[in-house]
Amino acid sequence: TYGEDPYLTSQMGLAVVKGLQGDGTGKYDKTHACAKHYAVHSGPEWNRHSFDSKNISQRDLWETYLPAFKALVKEGKVKEVMCAYNREPCCSNKQLLIRILREDWGYDDIVVSDCGAIGDFYYPNHHETHPTAAAASADAVVSGTDLECGGSYSSLNEAVQKGLISEEKINESVFRLLR
């Protein structure tokens, strides 16, 4: 982040997005900027793969953490959003990814996981919120995480075979990635 001031963070983030993506008037994208880490935490601390930000109040979430992301999505038209690590994994958090990001803010571009974040759902001594890679991967895609930085999504075929996710749901993510 650029600091704890939501307005300053928003303005600096918008300048970076505009500088990277351009003004959007060209035939092709200049490059994709990525707003990260949505939302609340993905710091460099040693415990980021087991950290739990449950002490963040709804007021703090809405007044401190979300304003910069909202500005980057609605004003900056950022092309990618990276979901954060957290004990309740942000990469499978339907409130953050579907209700707020996609429905309330109208975001229809790419959501990417931070590296290893989907693995944290099931790796021993990490978050351990899901029993297997297939369950974790299916939940992440259903929740709106289109692209994974890691190897867990290789289990999506198994997830389809087990009925954890449909091919149509996977195709939604694939289409966003290929646009």
Predicted regions and their residues:
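Glycoside hydrolase catalytic-domain context in secreted enzymes
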Residues: 1-179
